[in-house]
Amino acid sequence: MSRAQALPDPAAVGYPSFKLILVGDGGTGKTTFVKRHITGEFEKRYEPTIGVEVRPLDFHTSRGKVRFCCWDTAGQEKFGGLRDGYYIHGHCAIIMFDVTSRLTYKNVPTWHKDICRVCDNIPIVLCGNKVDMKNRQVKAKMVTFHRKKNLQYYEISAKSNYNFEKPFLYLARKLTGDMNLRFVEELALLPADVTIDLIAQQKIETEIAAAAAMPLPDEDEDGLMD
């Protein structure tokens, strides 16, 4: 087992540590997302044999500290698929797409298939990033893949810190088996680089909730038709 795969023994360090797989097309904001967590930026390390950066992100919860060892592709997805070593021993995953690029959403099923091929039945969160941008192309009604595969979905904006904590809170609850778990300390995040129109975003969130009550599209459409 490589140094990156050897997570701390919970009994020895006193807190649980989980390998978090972060995937998605290049340019969707994965690295920007994990770098918002200040402590993770200071402690990152590079694993050249697999081509990833591993960032330990700590969260203080009502059950004590929880650490996600976040595996970032470091751009390797631009050269084709990721090696199985990236996925092996993964406890959970985040699939990210860019709401201003339909292609990145269209490729979500491929990323999901890669995860499921190596990891058996782990909790997965789908994140639509860059909701602070005005030129949104993936409309609320188009986002249906998570419903087909029973994934959790969040709209996020890495640059504005919008909903940053939600994917981690959901995964921490699933992995600890405590759906009442909560964060007890404010997250140490970098200051927001941009602002987000919260009124407009709330309208979109309402549309997403309404779309969840609608019948799913045919398998080959996957919500990408207008």
Curated annotation (Swiss-Prot):
A GO term, aspect molecular function: GTPase activity
UniProt organism field = Oryza sativa subsp. indica (Rice)
Gene3D superfamilies linked = P-loop containing nucleotide triphosphate hydrolases
Q: Which residues bind GTP?
A: 25-32, 75, 129-132, 157-159
Q: Which residue stretches belong to region Switch-II? A: 75-91
Name the protein family: Belongs to the small GTPase superfamily. Ran family.
Region entry Switch-I, spans: 44-52
Question: Could you give one GO CC term from the UniProt record?
Answer: cytoplasm
Please give the CDD domains that the UniProt record associates with this protein. Ran
For this protein, the record's InterPro entries field holds: P-loop_NTPase (IPR027417), Ran_GTPase (IPR002041), Small_GTP-bd (IPR005225), Small_GTPase (IPR001806)
**Its domain of life?**
Eukaryota
The answer to keyword Transport applying to this record is: yes
Matching PANTHER family: GTP-BINDING NUCLEAR PROTEIN RAN-3, RAN GTPASE
Protein name per UniProt: GTP-binding nuclear protein Ran-3
Q: Which SMART domains match?
A: RAB (SM00175), RAN (SM00176), RAS (SM00173), RHO (SM00174)
Q: What's its job?
A: GTP-binding protein involved in nucleocytoplasmic transport. Required for the import of protein into the nucleus and also for RNA export. Involved in chromatin condensation and control of cell cycle.
